Amino acid sequence: MRRLYIALVCTQALHSAEEIAFGFYRRTPEIGARIQTIIPSFPILSMSATVFILLNIALVAILAASLPFVYRGTKYSRVMVRALGIAEFYNGAAHMTMAVVAGGYFPGAASAVVLFVLSVFVLRSTLRPEPNGVPRS
């Protein structure tokens, strides 16, 4: 579970870099407008490059800061691992959906596939007990 969590955090860092490099923040209003034709109440989100970059830096910093706690197996490490696994599952699925809606590549879609698959393994790892019967932490 710990190694998978480290891999997921590193993949999120790469995912953030891909989103920034290829302008995710510029393309979200376009996708929001397309989705809004199907779901009229769907919000159209937009933000500046600076805000988007700062949010991604903060996210990666928080995840990196959580690594020692998860690696040591602290009391709430399983909860942290599961929460990130769920978030990355939906993040990956959302990016792949946006690529389909866009009709091709959408910023973040390449690494989203890895996030999605890795999140499934991370979530599965939180459900498996250790061979000696002690839950993994």
For each predicted feature, which ranges?
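Membrane-helix boundary connector in multi-pass membrane proteins
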Residues: T74-G85, Y90-A109, R128
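Transmembrane alpha-helix/helix-exit interface in multi-pass inner-membrane proteins
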Residues: C10-I31
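A loop-to-helix transmembrane entry motif
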Residues: P40-V60, G108
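Perimembrane loop-to-helix junctions flanking transmembrane segments
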Residues: P29-I44
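Residues within membrane-spanning alpha-helices of integral membrane proteins
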Residues: Y5-Q12, V60, V81-E88, G92, ...
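Juxtamembrane helix-break-helix junctions at the cytosolic face
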Residues: A61-R78
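Membrane-water interface at the C-terminal end of transmembrane alpha helices
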Residues: F116-S137
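Membrane-interfacial loop-to-transmembrane alpha-helix junctions, especially the N-terminal start
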Residues: M1-Y5, Y76-L84, P135
